[in-house]
Design a protein with these regions (language model features):
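A short, N-terminal "cap"/entry segment at the start of jelly-roll beta-barrel domains
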Residues: 1-37, 116-122
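Short acidic-glycine-tyrosine-enriched beta hairpin
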Residues: 71-87
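Ligand-binding loop in jelly-roll beta-barrel domains
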Residues: 87-111
Length: 122
């Protein structure tokens, strides 16, 4: 993916699938200021607690994720629903069904681009 601003036109079938662990895979595309990630989580997949400077929007295409926020709130997000997570709010998630989600980040996740997101690779 480019490091500079340029026009991109593609489909997810052309974006490589990155298998992060046996239960989670993702595809990513990004521009100068925004990243879109297509994430597949099998039932029981766990995204450990983490936080990031990036604002995050999670849209559940199918399935459901149960998020636990650093302040103790538990929010179940199902198909057709969107969760907006502000910058630096600790959060974790569990796939309570096989789930397809689209995550939007601004700015793009530098750790994902560099492959240094070890919390997801366990």
């Amino acid at each position: 993916m480019p490091d500079t601003q340029e026009l991109q036109y593609t489909g997810f079938e052309q974006i490589p699938v990155e298998n992060l662990n046996p239960l989670v895979s993702r595809q990513m595309i990004w521009g100068e200021r925004t990243m879109l990630a297509r994430i597949v989580l099998r039932k029981g997949a766990v995204v450990p607690e983490h936080h990031h400077e990036n604002e995050q929007m999670t849209y559940i295409v199918e399935g459901a994720l149960r998020f636990t926020m650093g302040d103790g709130r538990v929010i179940t997000v199902g198909a057709g629903q969107v969760l907006v997570i502000p910058s630096n709010l600790p959060h974790s998630a569990v796939a309570i069904e096989d789930t397809l989600d689209l995550d939007i980040f601004t700015p793009p996740r530098a750790d994902w681009i560099a492959g240094t997101d070890t919390y997801l690779r366990r």
